[in-house]
């Protein structure tokens, strides 16, 4: 799919495509091969950081998990240098941020920052996902506010939200997270995602419009967007869905 977009010159000049990779060498290499010839791209690195995943899935201590992140960050920096024709922006996620100790989430993100050396002109994205929605939206916003105020070199970082919808509160979490200091949101069309889904970017965008804030998303042909979505995914949109329901 990505090769089709690049080879057929289907990506507008003002659009960045985003790719997601685990901190594994062969996946990082393949990811950059897929991006060859792309004008603008975000390369998004992630690894699991929560207490549960460290203890049960990886059986690793904190330093070993940081080592995984740093190794991946170095590989991405090395691979990006091989493709000077592409304007890369780097992104890092401590997966399961909401299940991670806040001081440790900060530590691992700053370790990645030390590798990538972002600047105010070339910011890196730090994405703080509620990989499994575990608590109330105000608690998520508290975590975002603390992180935003505590991270070093804040002017060199764009803080991103990635709310899942396990508790049915992803929209509230996203809106409160923005008010708490986040710069960016990741979401999906009509909430399509694993388990109970991810944040519906359309709802947040339309909610922002209703409050006089332009999300810089074009919803002028929202019914056509819905038709294409249903045709491509073979998934229905609930008739009581906000803004696009029947």
Name what the model sees in each region.
Residues 212-246:
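A mid-to-C-terminal "edge-of-domain" accessory segment
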Residues 20, 46, 93-95, 127-129, ...:
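Generic beta-strand/beta-sheet core signal
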Residues 124, 182-186, 202-210:
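Short acidic (Asp/Glu) and glycine-rich catalytic loops that position anionic groups and cofactors
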Residues 193-225:
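C-terminal helical cap(s) of enzyme catalytic domains, especially alpha/beta-barrels
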Residues 2-12, 25-159, 175-180:
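Alpha/beta enzyme core
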Residues 180-199:
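Glycine-rich phosphate-binding active-site loops on the catalytic face of alpha/beta enzymes
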Residues 27-28, 166-172:
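Short glycine/serine/threonine-rich phosphate/pyrophosphate-binding segments
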Residues 13-21:
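A glycine-rich helix N-cap at a beta->alpha junction
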């Amino acid at each position: 799919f990505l090769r089709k977009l690049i080879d057929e010159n289907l990506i507008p000049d003002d659009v960045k495509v985003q790719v997601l990779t685990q901190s594994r060498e062969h996946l990082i290499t393949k990811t950059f091969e897929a991006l060859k010839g792309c004008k603008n791209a975000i390369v998004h690195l992630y690894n699991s950081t929560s207490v549960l995943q460290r203890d049960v899935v990886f059986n690793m201590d904190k330093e070993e998990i940081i080592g995984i992140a740093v190794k991946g960050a170095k590989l991405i920096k090395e691979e990006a240098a091989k493709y000077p024709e592409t304007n890369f922006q780097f992104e890092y996620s401590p997966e399961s941020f909401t299940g991670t100790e806040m001081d440790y989430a900060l530590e691992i993100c700053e370790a990645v920052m030390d590798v990538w050396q972002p600047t105010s002109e070339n910011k890196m994205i730090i994405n703080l996902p509620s990989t499994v929605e575990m608590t109330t939206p105000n608690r998520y916003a508290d975590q975002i506010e603390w992180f935003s105020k505590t991270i070093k070199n804040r002017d060199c970082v764009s803080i991103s939200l990635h709310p899942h919808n396990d508790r049915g509160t992803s929209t509230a979490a996203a809106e409160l997270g923005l008010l708490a200091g986040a710069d960016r949101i990741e979401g999906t069309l009509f909430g399509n995602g694993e388990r109970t889904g991810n944040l519906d970017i359309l709802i947040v965008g339309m909610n922002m419009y209703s409050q006089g804030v332009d999300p810089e998303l074009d919803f002028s042909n929202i019914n056509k967007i819905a038709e294409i979505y249903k045709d491509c995914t073979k998934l229905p949109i609930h008739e009581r869905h906000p803004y696009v329901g029947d």
